[in-house]
Each structure stands twice: as structure tokens, then as C-alpha cells.
Amino acid sequence: MAHKKGGGSTRNGRDSRAKRLGVKRYDGQFVPAGSVLVRQRGTVFRPGRNVGMGRDYTLFALIDGYVKFEPISRDKRRVSVYPEPVGRTLPAPAGSATA
């Protein structure tokens, strides 16, 4: 007579891979055109000046420039790229000549 029940099976034990969402380039950073700025689900961050939005809501730079995060409302923000730094003096990008 068996004194232990059968082990049975479980329906757990699976998980999906992480999607690597989030902000990829930060405020004040210099970015070349085409750089991914934010990967997101839905529009937590809205595209601003010189920023495009992909089919999956990815925001990317349309021009070379400096990233700027701007508030829209309490829970929404806009990401823009400006050719010149906004609001503060930043060092020149690597490889540029200084006079």
C-alpha cells in the first residue's frame, strides 16, 4: 500500500523575457538623428519638436541635437530634440573643434 501520493504536475514555471522598456537617452544628452530616446507601451512620453514616434510608440530623434524633457501635465511629458542646448551650457560633443 502506497503511503505517498503521486507527485502530480504544475501549470506554473513560465515567464516572458524582459522587454527593455524605458528612457534610453536623458535630458541634456547630445544625440545623432535616428537615436532611440524612449521605448514605451502607450504614450507616457509624447513626441515633441524634432522627435518621431514609431508604430510601437518608440520615440526617436529626427535631427542631431540635445534631448529636452518638458512637462505637459501632471502625468504626461514631451520629449524634444533641439539643435542647441536649452537652458544651460553643455560641453561640445566629442570630436568637435573648439576655437
Curated annotation (Swiss-Prot):
GO terms for biological process, alphabetical: translation
Renumbered residue ranges of the record's region Disordered: 1-21
Entry GO MF terms: structural constituent of ribosome
Family per similarity comment: Belongs to the bacterial ribosomal protein bL27 family.
Keywords, in A-Z order: Ribonucleoprotein, Ribosomal protein
GO cellular component, one term: cytosolic large ribosomal subunit
NCBIfam families: L27 (TIGR00062)
Ribonucleoprotein as UniProt keyword: yes
Cystine bridges: none
Name of the protein in question: Large ribosomal subunit protein bL27
Keyword Membrane among UniProt keywords: no
Gene3D superfamilies named in the record: 2.40.50.100
PROSITE patterns referenced in this protein's UniProt entry, alphabetically: RIBOSOMAL_L27
Organism: Thermomicrobium roseum (strain ATCC 27502 / DSM 5159 / P-2)
Name of the gene encoding the protein in the UniProt record: rpmA
